[in-house]
């Protein structure tokens, strides 16, 4: 069951990263990845649709996945988005005051990797 959860978590994370970074991908990478991750098509179905080998689809999806993780590791856009959402929730629910909010917001914006 743990393997299934890890696979599901990885798929969900890839889907989120794809939404953030998809404009940095080629058209083919976007097409194959969207069909595989978001539309849940199999490698064979994608290969048939584009008249290419299943291996070519697998290679593209694998490279795209690695690229998405690499982009997040370098740019941290998903992580920053999560921090900003958390900050907004805290200010809306009065868990922090304006001064704390602004200080934390500056830290997120000027965050050094």
Swiss-Prot record:
Signal peptide interval: none
Domain of life the protein comes from: Bacteria
Entries under InterPro entries matching the protein: RNA_pol_sigma_r3/r4-like, UPF0122, UPF0122_fam_protein, WH-like_DNA-bd_sf
NCBIfam families xref list: PRK00118.2-6, YlxM
Similarity remark: Belongs to the UPF0122 family.
HAMAP family found in the cross-reference section: UPF0122
Biological function: Might take part in the signal recognition particle (SRP) pathway. This is inferred from the conservation of its genetic proximity to ftsY/ffh. May be a regulatory protein.
Descriptive protein name: UPF0122 protein MCAP_0480
